[in-house]
Amino acid sequence: MLVSRRLPSWLRQNLGEGGGHGETAGLIAELELETVCSSAKCPNRLECWSSGTATFMILGNVCTRPCGFCSVPKGKTEELEDDEPERVAEAARRLGLKHVVITSVTRDDLPDGGADHFRRTVEAVRQATGASIEVLVPDFIGKSGALEQLLKSRPDVFNHNTETVPRLYRQVRGRKSVYEWTLKLLADTKKIMPGTKTKSGLMLGLGETREELLQVFTDLLNHDVDFLTLGQYLQPTL
């Protein structure tokens, strides 16, 4: 049972449409794009959209993984939209983005997990803009050749989130996700394309201990991960 508690002032945000929020939202609607900001009901999206920032979500808006922390819809997926890469590129161009983040739902139903669609999207954005490009990818577990196919597009940053410590993996990420595979995916990226920066992130406050976090930090260092983000889990809202 969820208990409603008063949030501290620094977590509360106005729901106004001022600044660039309306412009960003309008463009996303016009081009019929998905963003993780909306699909995951991120509580920070008003702040991000007001500054012209958005994380584009490709491969549809229905995920094949039932991660407990995420509000993205789960269920029956739809066919890929062939012109989606060009629409993402057009949005990035019109927003004047200097750094573009492309993420996706997990598509276990696709033979390559959506890797080639990622490749096409990165290439379209690069052709349309001078922005640096970061991909935040699912694990592609069991998808032979998927990582190699995606990396043909040479993203500037390859991001795959660890999310939590190994002890909590099944509870937080579901039975299909494997901690060791996450580390392998990040390490294999460096082997295939040494010049690519790798990145991972964790949510704090899910019941992990300090010692468990330090072990994950060590594991990521040992697998040549360049960047680590740490965030506090905020329940999906709005």
Predicted regions and their residues:
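Flexible, acidic/Gly-rich N-terminal and inter-domain linker regions that tether
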Residues: 1-65
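Alpha-helix boundary/capping residues
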Residues: 28-31, 154, 172, 220
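Conserved Radical SAM active-site core
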Residues: 51-157, 162-168, 178-195, 200, ...
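Radical SAM enzyme [4Fe-4S]-AdoMet core and its adjacent flexible, acidic
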Residues: 170-180, 224-238
